């Protein structure tokens, strides 16, 4: 096993707080910063909050955006397609392709309430749905 592989395995075994400490020490040692590019600022915000210690780590783990994933259409595929069209404003062909290509996301980055409402509508017509 190479040195790189050994290092990767060691890093995989670290928890979040240990990773934050490692990042800080690497920045201090080599005078670099691990700042994310401007386009990835939505991803960088939770990492920055976790760097403030264990107290800040708990709020950073609370999820505010959810994805509604259609796992399986179930027996009432036509009804599921109608609900998918209602939820997404997709055309008939696009909604049919989404339903037939399950598992696929129906809604992404929505609030918990919207995700629960979408899941309820889809499960009501027999679809198998997961919220991530």
Curated annotation (Swiss-Prot):
<protein>
    <recommendedName>
        <fullName>Large ribosomal subunit protein bL12</fullName>
    </recommendedName>
</protein>
<dbReference type="Pfam" id="PF00542">
    <property type="entry name" value="Ribosomal_L12"/>
</dbReference>
<comment type="similarity">
    <text>Belongs to the bacterial ribosomal protein bL12 family.</text>
</comment>
<dbReference type="GO" id="GO:0003735">
    <property type="term" value="F:structural constituent of ribosome"/>
</dbReference>
<keyword id="KW-0687">Ribonucleoprotein</keyword>
<comment type="function">
    <text>Forms part of the ribosomal stalk which helps the ribosome interact with GTP-bound translation factors. Is thus essential for accurate translation.</text>
</comment>
<dbReference type="GO" id="GO:0022625">
    <property type="term" value="C:cytosolic large ribosomal subunit"/>
</dbReference>
<dbReference type="InterPro" id="IPR008932">
    <property type="entry name" value="Ribosomal_bL12_oligo"/>
</dbReference>
<dbReference type="InterPro" id="IPR000206">
    <property type="entry name" value="Ribosomal_bL12"/>
</dbReference>
<dbReference type="GO" id="GO:0003729">
    <property type="term" value="F:mRNA binding"/>
</dbReference>
<comment type="subunit">
    <text>Homodimer. Part of the ribosomal stalk of the 50S ribosomal subunit. Forms a multimeric L10(L12)X complex, where L10 forms an elongated spine to which 2 to 4 L12 dimers bind in a sequential fashion. Binds GTP-bound translation factors.</text>
</comment>
<dbReference type="InterPro" id="IPR013823">
    <property type="entry name" value="Ribosomal_bL12_C"/>
</dbReference>
<dbReference type="InterPro" id="IPR014719">
    <property type="entry name" value="Ribosomal_bL12_C/ClpS-like"/>
</dbReference>
<dbReference type="InterPro" id="IPR036235">
    <property type="entry name" value="Ribosomal_bL12_oligo_N_sf"/>
</dbReference>
<keyword id="KW-0689">Ribosomal protein</keyword>
<dbReference type="Pfam" id="PF16320">
    <property type="entry name" value="Ribosomal_L12_N"/>
</dbReference>
<dbReference type="GO" id="GO:0006412">
    <property type="term" value="P:translation"/>
</dbReference>
């Amino acid at each position: 096993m190479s040195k790189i592989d050994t290092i990767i395995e060691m890093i995989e075994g670290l928890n979040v707080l240990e990773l934050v400490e490692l990042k800080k020490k690497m920045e201090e040692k080599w005078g670099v910063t691990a700042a994310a590019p401007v386009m990835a600022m939505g991803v960088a915000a939770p990492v920055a909050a976790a760097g403030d210690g264990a107290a800040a780590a708990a709020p950073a783990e609370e999820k505010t955006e959810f994805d509604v994933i259609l796992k399986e259409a179930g027996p009432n595929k036509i009804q599921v397609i109608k609900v998918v069209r209602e939820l997404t404003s997709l055309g008939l062909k696009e909604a049919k392709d989404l339903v037939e290509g399950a598992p696929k996301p129906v809604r992404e980055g929505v609030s918990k309430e919207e995700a629960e409402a979408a899941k309820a509508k889809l499960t009501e017509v027999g679809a198998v749905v997961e919220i991530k």
